[in-house]
Amino acid sequence: MAFVPVTGAIAGATAAAAYVDAKFHITKDIRGIRGQKAAARALEKNSQGKGQSLWYQFETQVRRLPSTEECIWSRTGCYTWAETYANACRYGQYLHQNGVVPGQLFAMYMMNRPEFLFTHLGGWSIGSAPAWINYNLAGDALVHCLKVSEAKVLIVDEDQECRQRIEDVRERLEGELGMTILVLDNALKGEISRTEPKRPEDELRVGMKGKFPLFLFYTSGTTGHPKACPFETQRAAGLTGRVGAMGLKPGPNGDRWYVCMPLYHGTGGTTALVCMVTGLTCCIGTKFSTSKFWSDVRDSRSTAMVYVGETARYLLNAPPSDLDRKHNIRAMFGNGLRPDVWQRFVDRFGIEVVGEFFNSTEGVMALFNGSRGPFTATSVGHQGFIDRWRFHNTYVPVEIDFATGDLVRDPKTGFCKRKSYKDGGEILVQMPSESAFVGYWNNPDATEKRFERNVFKKGDLWYRTGDALRRDADGRWFFMDRLGDTFRWKSENVSTAEVSEALGSFPGIQEANVYGVEVPGHDGRAGCAALYIDPAHRDSFDFNALLAHVKAKLPKYAVPVFLRVQKQQTTMHNNKQNKVPLRNDGIDLRKLMERADKEAKEQGKEEAEYDTMYWNPAALGAGKGKTDGDSYVVYTMADWDLLKGSKDVEGGAKL
């Protein structure tokens, strides 16, 4: 009967192992590590020794899937895998015949449509890769992005507004940059469609490996213009691994991923490419629309969706409907899903899996949370014991001076102060060498600024993420704040320096100090500009002319929603602009007046001078009863009270 205690011992050991696994999430970590290795092996296998180009991954899916299986769905046209492959070959030939050569980039200024993917895949087919240009950009910022890319060929969307923005700078693009501009209108699309879909030779793709980019995309910084980041070919396994982590199934009859985020944007564009190289159907939405979102999802038979934080809030703000669960979406993938939105969205729309990720555009730090329940809800990443051990001295929180943005260093040792993961701080990432960070494309100065040296010991090298996060005892990572000047609005990064430059070029403005402010009922921060206007121009200053001026120079999401006209210029001791008190005041006029009263008292003044604030209600969907359209009007305490009271009303701040 000795087997009885043995059986009991086995049962006890099994229970103990299950407890340890549940507490420390060992299996989850091992599954993640194996998944990444499997993705890397698949890339190597599908290339068949011909190189690392993801073109071969795409071809593998084309061969594997039935020719009648749908590859791309859109309102403007649907395409099977065979049709998509033929079009990619045609576009590759056209690009090659018109100056795009292997090993060099070309540029795409295109909206969400199947031709975006035909063009991108066509570039891969000939050993090239695209620079994704934000189609909202105009003027100097647009020229800057194209110049940085060093592309000599620009593919332009047929949309009339896109074409006009290019026409406005055509002379500079052709003269200064030597670019060939090709507008993908109906005539050109017809010409390309009539060519024979001949497969480009393998020799064209031999250079697509290692650090050669799969694409170039842009991030707003504090230098005034977007910075370009290459997504290296050697990072491809990180892309394809997300499919398994989300529990998605490739075709035939597999999952269908709805993407209405801009394809020039990292989240939207990479998801579309993942579909192409893993065998999922990509369902393309022209742009995000609360009213059209679910009809697109239902008509496309999508089973997964892409989001940014604001997307979920906007959809949640729509009135409840009997159709809320009449869809096939079971998984959603993206970033920035706010804690106050997360569970309400999941419960209302019946979502099974939320794939929330945190990643710097530069690709230095990556976290992922495949949440299937309340335990990991609201976290941007989750690490079990193994991953916590692996990254303990790689992802490190440090103390920062929030007023200056500088790392806090010990006055005696000169080294930084490490924070506990529980308390959190700005996350630094240890770098084995400078070459480990791919850096910004053709911008070594900006690359150098992301490094921090001698952090914990002499000679060490770290990358500053510019983001504050914390991690709890269960391995869940939570986003705390975005540090520095750049802020997010309408799911885009807004560069304060770029906005300041646009404002400063308007007659009468002597100084523009730009920062982001929180608005009740809205994700991110809206742009606010503290202006010091030349006294000679104050009485005749035209605020609506200013609005027209900045709208012509900036993307729509970067145009300031609020203006604060200052009585006095405010600088720090070193003549740098001081954003901290302005940001703390926000748009609450009571706080603004309280601080002014306090400062007047400290300075012995009998009466305080108050700044005047203006706003554009239409930019928040709050124009009803205020104005007939876009315009800056005086902002009052009553407006603030209404904004606070409307945060739970449909559509955010709708007055």
Where are these regions (language model features)?
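Conserved AMP-binding/adenylate-forming core of the ANL superfamily
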Residues: 47-51, 68-121, 138-143, 234
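Conserved pre-ATP/AMP-binding loop-to-beta segment of ANL
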Residues: 67-70, 183, 197-218, 225, ...
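AMP-binding/adenylate-forming catalytic core of the ANL superfamily
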Residues: 137, 143-144, 154-156, 429-461, ...
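Conserved C-terminal "lid"/linker of ANL adenylate-forming enzymes
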Residues: 180, 513-519, 528-530, 543-655
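Conserved AMP-binding A3 loop
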Residues: 80-82, 205-207, 214-238
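Conserved AMP-binding/adenylation subdomain of ANL enzymes
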Residues: 237-256, 264-304
